[in-house]
């Protein structure tokens, strides 16, 4: 019934298994990949025909984590997997980016890749396994695919690289780097690093590429056993048509790409392309698409030739020059921190908001619930490129760009112990002509500094490009949108003066050598240093204090055995503290208490209240208190947060008090001295030895009572004679009839 094919390899000391032929047999290609006890199923399907008028490759990748994979049931009202989470979206992009360039030009069949995590052991991360499974499924499907690719994650600790580190190892690692690559070329890099030098980053990429070679070999072996017949790809001889397009458009395209302003250049290109419609009025839809593709190739040829032969870029810059930069902080008056960062025709308006611990992002996933205190959200409205388009919930691109900027800034943030705030950075791209994610990094850094967040060091980011031909290559600093589209590499680097914090690379062609990558990193280092210098003109260092509009957060510690006293039964005490003082109070299991309010006086009031609860009263010390209950023999006074003591009627005044309520009332503020604390913790207080106006201690001039140890004096014990033993007592039924109860009498 099943024709199962399997490949097993030892990969970094663990067994990696690729299997096909048992599950999802109706898909064009399906593979179950297993590493440890983590299992990912990936299935590939593709449409057999192309939709009419389609001129692009519609590849869709979906990655999904099943809660059942980790033995969990989804939280909340809906008990099933719902829309893609941010993590699932990011991993979908991680799978998409290295495989998309490997589909041949002209293949426009709709293709769907679905990767699902079916089992998760908490040790082997499923994202790398999903990339491998997707590559293997494509290799088996027969769909035109110039792969396969392999994937690997690299950590770095104590000067050593770690292949596919566990979650525990990643927490201690200075690097989290993911590489997707073919046998001969690196296609994709995604990383976060703790300010590592360029040499370490380059060696990490090389280590990953070498380490994933056994995976590629296993996929090839599996494909030799189980791959379907390859699809035929329709090709056209467009040499004559290409010559005609070049004849009609070359001069106008060349003039357009000498215009340095984007809007003028776009208008000129539109007019130049209008000539093609007039020249080919009888062209059918398919032929029109081919003409448009040839025109795009001609544009690329003009731009690439100018860069390689003349060293001239679209906007007139040389290869290393960064566009003019203008930075401004405090741009928005009511935010906690803000910055407007403009680089050429790319602009980001970024704000920072500080909040308390209850504003942390709750994330529910395979590893359970956890909370994130740093959030970065990136928005790309259509007006930023002068277009009409969808505006609303963030798309995959916005989520991906936001995460890239998050990785760049995250390593330089202070620890929660040093800066106990929840931090949200919001970046709105108001203009875009390339490298908007790196503008978010620069603007986000300035907004954080403006908000008073004590960063380790400022961070800047730059996008690099590459033009690669057989006779040479050129590396471009701070690429524009057109250079991104017409070039061969998008290489984003962010970091401090000390080292790299984030690196993302997407390569569209094979042949990127280690020499090219090394030169790109060195050129990016110079660009980042220049940008840091320009940023420092707006704000050279972190503000010494946070904004007056931001909440103040202070911490204190209480003994663990006192936590329940601070919280109170059903949270009664802590709710009273919050309601009375106006400060938020958060208590952790280790006894750490965080007090927050926009008014420092509220924080101080809450601190004093909590200190009053956890501190032990001291005999002989004077405290401020409040009468909470009046009884016949005195009054109960709350004098230390939740601590009450008794002021006996004799300790209210030196003179006799006949009725306590004549002197005191509930809610009255009084000053008391602690006289005694018994072995049960009950406290005896006195008001009469304290000046109720000043709080000063008074001399106790009242003479002590005689025989004070026994109120009312010693009374003689009445002698009732020897006590009878119980056996001497007459039984109830032996009582005299006249004294016995009626129901015991014999005559009753």
Curated annotation (Swiss-Prot):
Keyword Ion transport: no
Signal peptide positions (record): none
Residues annotated for Mg(2+) binding in this entry: 484, 490
Regions of compositional bias (Basic and acidic residues) in chain numbering: 699-736
GO biological process: mRNA catabolic process; RNA processing
Keywords: Cytoplasm, Magnesium, Metal-binding, Nucleotidyltransferase, RNA-binding, Transferase
Keyword Secreted in record: no
GO cellular component terms listed in the entry, alphabetical order: cytosol
UniProt region (Disordered), positions on chain: 693-748
SUPFAM superfamilies: Eukaryotic type KH-domain (KH-domain type I), Nucleic acid-binding proteins, Polynucleotide phosphorylase/guanosine pentaphosphate synthase (PNPase/GPSI), domain 3, Ribonuclease PH domain 2-like, Ribosomal protein S5 domain 2-like
Residues of the KH domain: 551-610
Location of the protein in the cell: Cytoplasm
Any one GO molecular-function label of the UniProt entry: magnesium ion binding
Catalytic activity of the protein: RNA(n+1) + phosphate = RNA(n) + a ribonucleoside 5'-diphosphate
Matches recorded under Gene3D superfamilies: GHMP Kinase, N-terminal domain, K Homology domain, type 1, Nucleic acid-binding proteins
EC numbers for this chain: 2.7.7.8
Cofactor(s) listed: Mg(2+)
S1 motif domain location: 620-688
NCBIfam families noted in UniProt: polynuc_phos, PRK11824.1
Summary of the function given for this chain in its UniProt record: Involved in mRNA degradation. Catalyzes the phosphorolysis of single-stranded polyribonucleotides processively in the 3'- to 5'-direction.
PANTHER family in UniProt: POLYRIBONUCLEOTIDE NUCLEOTIDYLTRANSFERASE, POLYRIBONUCLEOTIDE NUCLEOTIDYLTRANSFERASE 1, MITOCHONDRIAL
Similarity comment: Belongs to the polyribonucleotide nucleotidyltransferase family.
Protein name (database record): Polyribonucleotide nucleotidyltransferase
Species the sequence originates in: Zymomonas mobilis subsp. mobilis (strain ATCC 31821 / ZM4 / CP4)
Gene that produces this protein: pnp
